């Protein structure tokens, strides 16, 4: 198994695993290597084996994705289309904070400090095994308090007025419950298509925020 992974980064002979024509992705291969390396290191420490065969394995290089952002001249149309869909508050907050999608959708009304114009980020939502699961962010540094503009506070207050009995800042117009991250991503893609903008990932809105903040001298921290 490990020799196959080491030589080509692919496991084609395991036919019960459904793989694409090109085999496993670079990230998956590197993840498998990390897991095996840690296990084998422990085996060496416990004197179960003499050496770690994972040492010196040549891993496939991570491909650098070209960073894309939403062009400035598309931000207005983007937000206008979001407003038409009843989702201006969510997308406005995203473009003014650069939150991760899971962080954005896990926000509670109690996370908003209207008086001090801040929002507390302490959790994220992901779909795991078909269920929406709320958990802590990736790292301790991801737990933070962010300053937000007055307009964002106003929009969030209006948003809360639409569903005052829900603890969440943003709820799905279809279900009235927590917004599904995948559904939210699809909405982002529909907005891009509607305004004739080049496709960018939802994650690229974080890059958009960071790029524009640096351009206009805003502290992204």
Predicted regions located by residue number:
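Short, basic (Lys/Arg/His-rich) helix/loop patches that form interaction surfaces
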Residues: 13-14, 22, 77-87, 97, ...
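Short, flexible, glycine-rich and Lys/Arg-enriched loop motifs at helix boundaries
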Residues: 123-141
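Generic beta-structure capping elements
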Residues: 3, 59-62, 122-124, 151, ...
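Basic/aromatic-enriched alpha-helical hairpins
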Residues: 1-22, 39-42, 196
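Basic, Lys/Arg- and aromatic-enriched nucleic-acid-binding interface segment
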Residues: 12-14, 21-26, 30-32, 45, ...
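Hydrophobic residues embedded in beta-strands of well-ordered beta-sheets
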Residues: 117-119
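Alpha-helical scaffold segments in carbohydrate-active enzymes
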Residues: 4, 28-31, 35-45, 216
């Amino acid at each position: 198994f490990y020799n196959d992974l080491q030589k080509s980064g692919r496991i084609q002979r395991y036919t019960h695993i459904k793989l694409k024509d090109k085999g496993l992705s670079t990230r998956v291969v590197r993840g498998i290597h990390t897991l095996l390396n840690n296990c084998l290191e422990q085996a060496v420490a416990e004197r179960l084996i003499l050496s770690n065969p994972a040492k010196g394995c040549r891993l496939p290089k991570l491909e650098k994705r070209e960073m894309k952002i939403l062009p400035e001249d598309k931000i207005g149309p983007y937000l206008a289309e979001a407003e038409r869909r009843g989702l201006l508050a969510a997308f406005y907050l995203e473009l003014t904070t650069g939150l991760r999608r899971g962080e954005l959708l896990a926000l509670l009304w109690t996370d908003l400090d209207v008086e001090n114009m801040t929002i507390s980020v302490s959790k994220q939502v992901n779909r795991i095994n078909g269920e929406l699961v709320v958990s802590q962010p990736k790292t301790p540094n991801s737990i933070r308090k962010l300053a937000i503009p007055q307009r964002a506070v106003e929009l969030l207050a209006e948003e809360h007025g639409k569903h005052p009995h829900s603890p969440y800042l943003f709820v799905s117009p279809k279900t009235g419950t927590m917004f599904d991250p995948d559904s939210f991503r699809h909405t982002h893609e529909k907005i891009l298509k509607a305004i004739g903008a080049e496709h960018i990932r939802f994650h690229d809105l974080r890059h958009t925020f960071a790029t524009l903040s640096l351009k206009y001298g805003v502290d992204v921290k």
